[in-house]
Amino acid sequence: MSTIEIVSTVAEYTEIHSPVSSKFLLPSARDSSSSISLFSAIFWFWSWLFFKIMNIFLYYIPNIIVNLFSVNFQITLSLSSIVITLTGIISFCFLIVRYKYLTRYSKTTKSTDKPKSSNKNIDLVGSIKKNKRGDSKSTSNYLDEFLSAIKVFGYLERPVFHELTRNMTTQKLSSEEILYLDEKLGFSIVVEGTIQVYTKVNSVNSSTTSNSDDNELNFEKDDLLTIGDQCYQLLNEVKSGSPLSSLMSTLDLFKPVDPDTMSNRLFSPFELDSNPASNPLSPDNTGSKSFDPLSSGNFNDTSLSSSDRNYPNIVARPKPIEDSNNLNTATIAIIPYSAFQKVQSKYPKATSHIVTMVITRLYKITMNTIHSYLGLTREIIRSEIQLNESEGAKDSLPSYLYDGVIEKFYGDKNNETLLNKTAESPSVSINKTSSSSSSLPKKSTTSLRPLNRNQSSRYVVLDSRSKSTHPGDLLSSVPLSRRSDYYQTHTTIQPDPEEVRSQSRTKMTSPVLPKRQISSNGGPTLKGHSSSTTKFENIRDRTFSDEREETEETSLRIAIIENIFKILGINEVSNMIGSMSDLNSRSSSVNSSVVGLPSLMNNGNESKYPNGIFDFNTGKVRYDSISSFPTSLNKGANNNLKFYDTVNQSQLKDMDHENDKSSQVDINNLMFKRKSIPIQSFESNFYDVKNEFSKHLNIKYFGPNTTLVEQESFNSGLYYVIDGTLDVFYKPASKESENLTPMNKKKLYTVKSGGLAGYLSSIIGVRSLVSISTPGDKGVIVAHIPKNEFSKLLDKFYFLQLPVASKLKSLLSSQILTIDYALEWCHIPAGDVLCSQGDLANGFHIVLSGRFRVVRYNNNKSSEVNPDDNTDIHDYNNNLIDESLSYKSRKKKDDITILGEYGHGETIGEVEVLTASRRTNSLIAVRDSETARIPRTLFEMLSLRNPSIMVKVSRIVANKMAKKDNIGIPSTISSNVPLIVTNTDSHISNDYKTITILPTVSGLPVRDFADKLVSALKNIGRNVIALDQASTLTHLGRHAFDERLAQLKLSGYFAYLEEEYQTIVYVCDTPLKSNWTSTCISQGDCILLLADADDDDVATNIGEYERLLMKLKTTARTDLCLIHADKYVEPGSTSVWLKNRIWVQGHHHIQMEIARDNSVQQGQKTSIIKNIAAKISSRTNTNIKSRLENVKTKAILSLNKFNNRLSRRTHSYKTVQAHKNDFLRLARILSNESVGLVLGGGGSRGISHVGVVMALEKHGIPIDLIGGTSIGSFVGGLYAKDYNIVSIYGRAKRFAKRVSSWWRMVLDLTYPVTSYITGYEFNRGIWKIFGSSEIEDFWIRYFCNSTNITNSTMDIHESGFSWRFIRASMSLAGLLPPITYGGSMLLDGGYLDNLPVMEMKKKGAKYIIAVDVGSVDDRTPMNYGDTLSGFWVLFNRWNPFSRHPNVPNMMDIQLRLAYVASVNALELAKKTPGVIYLRPPIDDYATLDFAKFDEIYHVGMAYADNLLTRWEQTGKIPPIAGMIDRSRIRNGEERKSLYRRSSI
C-alpha cells in the first residue's frame, strides 16, 4: 500500500469517529498526480498523534472524574469497628517506633565480641621455654663463661681487663678428683661443668651426723663427703660462669707480703673471737695460721684432733652426674696472685674500683641477708665491738691537746658537772669555720682558734700563752709535737724474726690484750718493739717552712685523724712502701698515682719457692694443698702440672692415717733483709691526706640523753669519742616492737674515750643497725666526720680503700665470712627465668633490685595440639574425674596464669626449701634484676648451729601467708569461707620501684609530666628521684652509654639509687635512637605511655616510641596515660586507643595543658561539623555574630549561677580541690596507696550513696578506684564518669523519678514467664543517664560485678558500654530479665557479693571505704515443728497474739537462698584490713521507694557527715596519702592539709 493510501484511510477514520469539527481534520488526499513528500506525511502523522493524546488528558479523563464524583454511595460502620481499627493503626505505628527507632541505642551499643582483656602473657611462654636461667647454650665457650663471672669485679677498663686475663690459666678436674682450693694462690672461676664446694665440719658433728640417720635435722647423705676420717659438708654448688673463689679473697690477693705489718697479722681480730671457747685455731697447729674465709670458725670446737689439723678447710669436686654417658668433669680458670699484684701496681685506681665492688657486695648481699633475713644482726655488730677493743681504739690524745679541749668546752674542770646540768643546747659544735661557741655557758669564754694554714707557725700555739698566770712558761717557747713518740714514727723498723715469732706465740696463747700506748701514734709503729731500734731524726735538718708547723687547733685535728686512721687500719708505712715502689714501677694508665697501692711483694723472690706459697703469718713457704696427706695419695696426680693440687677420690679408701707435717722453708731471713726505704718524700703526701680529712672534722659537744644516730638512719658518719662515753642500743625490727618505748631498747656496748662509733654505717654504706646516744648523767665530746664527706674523701684518696677494706675483713667473724662465700649474687636479664615450675628447690632468693613476675602453667598437657574429646582441659590436680555423662565446658583456660609479682626486698622460694619440694611456679624477670641466693645447704647448716634462723624464716613464711589472707587470697582450699570464682587475675602489688615515662610520639611534655608526678609522689611521702639523660651523664660522664663495659657501671649506679630511694622515675626525654631511651624502657617496673587524647592519628596508628617498646619486648606493666586539656572524655574515644594496643594493661585519664604547635595541629583530624560552623561563622554578619556571642556568654553565666545555687543548696564542694588532683591519684596508684570506694546494692536504699559521696567530698577524702553492685554500680558509675558531685545528684534524681513512675512500669509489663516486665523502660532510663559512654571513658577507674548464671561465676566488668553492664548488675531476678552477653546470662551481682570488697582489694586499694545498704534478714529463731500448714501461717500473720508471726513465705525463702553467698562475703569484707565500713540507717525504706529520693539522700548525707566529723576529731581516720602534704612533715614543717573544706 502506498503512502497516499494510508493517509486517506486515516483521514476517513478520523472523520467518521471524531466528534471534533471538520476544521480540525486532516486535509484530504489529493490526486494521485499530486506529489506529496515523505516528510510532510510524517509531520502530519505526529501532529495528529499529539492532538489525540491531548484530547485524552484534557477531555476523557476529566469527564470520567466528574462522572465518578457524581455517583452516590453509603458506608455504615459500628463504633466498635471504628475503635478497633484506630487501635490497630495506632498500635502498628507504636510498634514500629518502639522497636525500630527507640531501641536503636541498644543495637548501636551492643558489643559483638567480649571486651579486650589486658594481655599480660605476651612472650611469657617463649621466655619460660627459651630463657631458662642456667641452661647451657650450644655456642657458649670458656670466654663467655669467664666474661659472665668477671662481672663480679664491676666496671673494669680495657687495660685492666687484659692485665687480669694475660696470665690466666685453666685446670680440668676429672670425676674422681678432689680439689684443695687455696684462695691465696689466685681467683678461680668455673668455666665448664658444676663444682660442689665442701667445708670441713668438726669431728663431733660428723660422728653425730653419721650415727643419727633418723634425725631429720641432720644433713642429707648426698651433702656429705668423707676424706679419711674427716667429714665435709656441702656448702654450695657453683655452676659454669660463676666465681669459685670468694670476692673477699681479692683483698688478700692485692696485699703484698709486708714484713712490717706481720706482727699485726699474727693477731687477727677474728682469730680471737669474743667467745674464747670458739677459737678455731690452736697454737700448735702446723698449718696456716691465717684465717681462711671458709674455715669453720665459730662452727667448730677448739679441741681439734690431730688428724683434723692435717686436712684442708675447703675442698671441691665436680658434681656427680647420674647419666653415665656424660663424664662429670669440670674446668676452672685461675687468675693468679701475680696478676692482681701487677694490677694494683700499674692501675691503683682500678684496684680501688674492685675494692669498692667487694664492699658493695658485702653490703648488698651479705649484710642485707644476715640482718634482714637470717636474723644474725649481732654477728655484724660484734665486729664494731671488736674494733673498739683493738689496740688503736685505746690510744688517747696527748695530754696537752686533751686538756685544751676540756678547758674550751667545760671551762674549769670542776664545773663540768655544772655544765651538764645547765646546758641549754644538746649539741655544741666547734668546726673549722667557727671561732667561738655561743651556746657554751657564760663561764666558758675561751674559743678555739680558726684553722688557717697561712698563719701557721713552727710552734704549737697554745691558749695558755695568752694567760697571765703563766709568765715565762718554758713550754710556750718550745716546739711541740702532737705525738710524744714522734721520732719513733720516722724510722725504718727491722724486727728480729725470732722476736716476731715469739711474740706471736705469746699472743696466741694469752687472751690478754697488749697494753696500749699512751701516745697517739698516727704512724705504723709496731706494738711491743722497744725504741732501741729507733733511728732518730735530726731536728736540725728541719726548717721553719716544714709542713708540720701548726697551731693548736690544727694539731688537735691532725691528732684525731691519726687516731681514726689507726683504728681504720690505715697504715702510713704500708702506704709509703707502696708509694715508693710505685715510683719505680712502669705505669701505663692515667689512673696510676704517685700515692699508689702496694706493689709486688717480694722483688722476685717468689721464683725461689715456685711450688709453694708464702704464709703471711708464719713467715714460711707452705707447700700447699694436700701435701699434708700421705704421699700414697699423690702418686697418680701430676701435681707439678696443675695450679691447684688435687687428690684422687678413689684412692681415699687406702689412706694411711699418719700425719705428715707440711714441708716448710724458713725464709724469715730472706723477707726481713729489705733495705731501708727513704720516707721523706712520702711524708708530705700523707700529711696532705690527713690535712684534707681534718678539714671535714667537726668537734661537737652533746648533752645527756641526746640521740646522735637513730636506728635505720642512712646518713650518720664517724664519731670519735674525745671525752665521755656513747651508749649503743639495738631494737629488734618486728611488728610487736614498732610502738615500744625506749625502755625496750637493749644496750649492746659502750664506746669509751678514744673509741669510734658509726663504723659499719660509714665504711660499708649500710643503714645504721643501732642507735647511738649519750648517757643520762653526762655529756660527751666527739669529733664527727659526716658520712657523705667521708665517702668523698675515700673516693678522692682511693689508695686508702684497700687498707680500710682489709681492716673490715679482719673484724668480720668466721661465720659472716662463710656466709659471704656461700651466698650467690645472681644477675638475671629482662625476660629470663629465675626458676621454672617443676625444678628442684635448691635455695631461696632475696630480690635486691628489679622485679619478678610469678606465673603458673594451667595445662600440663600443653604439648597436645589437638586434644580429643576425652582430654582433660581443666586442672583437677590429677584427680579421677568421670565426665562421660556430664556437660563439659569447652572453655579453655589460658596457658599461663599470673599470680603476682615480687619487688625489692621480698623473698622468693622459702616454702619449697622448707618443704623439700619442687618449684610450684615460674619466676620471670620483668627487667634486669639482681638477687641474693641462699643455698639450701648453707641454710640447713646455719639452722643446725643457729636454731634462731629457722625461727626467723618460719616467721617470714607465716607473715607472708597472713598477708595473703589479709588481701583476700585464701591460702588453702579448705577455707571455711566459700570461694567465689571470678574472671579476674590474682592480686599484683602496685608498689613499683622504678617508673618510666615514655611518650608515644615526640613533642609531648614528658618533662612537665615527670615534674608533676614527682611532686605528687613527694606529697604522699615517697622518697623519690627523677632521672633524665642530663642528670645521669653528670654523674657517670658523657660516655656512660657508649662503652661496652660501662653497662656494669651504669647498673651499679641504678642499684645504688634503688637502695637510696623508694621510687625512681626515669624520664625519657631523648630522641628515639638514643641509648637513654632503651635504658629507660629496660629499667622500668611500670611504663607510663603518654599520649595526647585529641590526637586521632596516633590513636588509630602506632607511635614511633611504641614500636621501639614492642621491639625490645619488655614484660613490664604498661599503662596508657591519656592527657586531656579539659576534664572531659569523648564517649567511645578511649576504646580507639586501647583496641589495637594489646601491650597496654591499663589506662589513666590525666588533665594537663599541652602546648601544641602548628605541625601537631595539622596532623590532627578536625570535625566536619566544626568546619561547617567555621565557614558559616566566617560568612555571617559581624553584628549577628556578636549578638550570638553575647547570648552564649549570658547562657554560660546563667548556667554557672544555677550550679552555684545548687552547690549552696546541696553543701557541695569547691570546683577545684587539691586532693582531687589527677597526679596525686596516679601517684597513689603507683605507690600502692590508693583509696577505693565500694558501694553496695539495696534498691532505693542506695540513694543514700549520693549523700555519702557528698560527705566524702566535703571532708576532702580522695577516691582513686570505684566499684559497685546493683544500685551501687549506678551511683558509682556516675561518680567515676565525671568525678563531680553536682552531676551525680541531678542524674540520680532524674533516674529515681523515672523508675518511680507507675505508668511506665505498667506499660512495660509482660507475661511473667521470665520476668514481670520487659526491662525496656529500665534500660532506657539507664541509657538516658550514661548514653554511649564506655567504662574505659570514665575518669576514675571503675568496675561493677554481675552474677553469670550460665557459668555460675561472678563476672567483673571493667570495659564495654557502661549502661549495659550497670543494667546487668541491677537485674533483680523475676523483676527484670537477665542481660545476655557473650552467650551468658547476667543477673544482679548482689547474689554472690553485694559488697565487692575482695575485688577492690585485688585491684590494689590500700584503704577501702565500703558503704552497705543491703536489707537485713530476720534472724528470729523459728520453731514451728516438722510440718507446716499454709492456713496456720496465714492465721498467725493476722493474729496479734501469735508467737510465730514471721514465718517466711516461698519468695522470702528463695531470696534468702539466693543471698547466702553474699552474706558470708559481707562478713569477710568487714574483717578485711584497711576497710572503713559504713552503714547508713536506711532499714525503714523498701527496695522500690525511689519516690523518697530527697529523704533517703539526706539520711545518708547526715549520717556520713556526722560520722566522719567524729572520726576526724578523735583521730580515727587512717593516714590517707594525699590528704596531708607529707613532704612538709619530712622537712620538719607543720602538718598542712591539701584541701579546704567548703563552708555549709
UniProtKB/Swiss-Prot annotation:
Basic and acidic residues bias (residue ranges): 537-546
UniProt domain PNPLA: residue ranges: 1237-1401
Regulation of protein activity: Inhibited by organophosphorus esters.
Keywords: Endoplasmic reticulum, Hydrolase, Lipid degradation, Lipid metabolism, Membrane, Repeat, Transmembrane, Transmembrane helix
EC number: 3.1.1.5
Motif interval(s): GXGXXG: 1241-1246
Binding locations of a nucleoside 3',5'-cyclic phosphate 2: 807-960
GO cellular component, one term: endoplasmic reticulum membrane
Binding site for a nucleoside 3',5'-cyclic phosphate 1: 681-811
Cytoplasmic topological domain residue ranges: 1-37, 98-1544
Pfam families: NTE_Ploop (PF24179), Patatin (PF01734)
Biased composition annotated in UniProt, kind: Polar residues: 275-310, 448-458, 517-536
Protein name (Swiss-Prot/TrEMBL): Lysophospholipase NTE1
Provenance organism: Debaryomyces hansenii (strain ATCC 36239 / CBS 767 / BCRC 21394 / JCM 1990 / NBRC 0083 / IGC 2968)
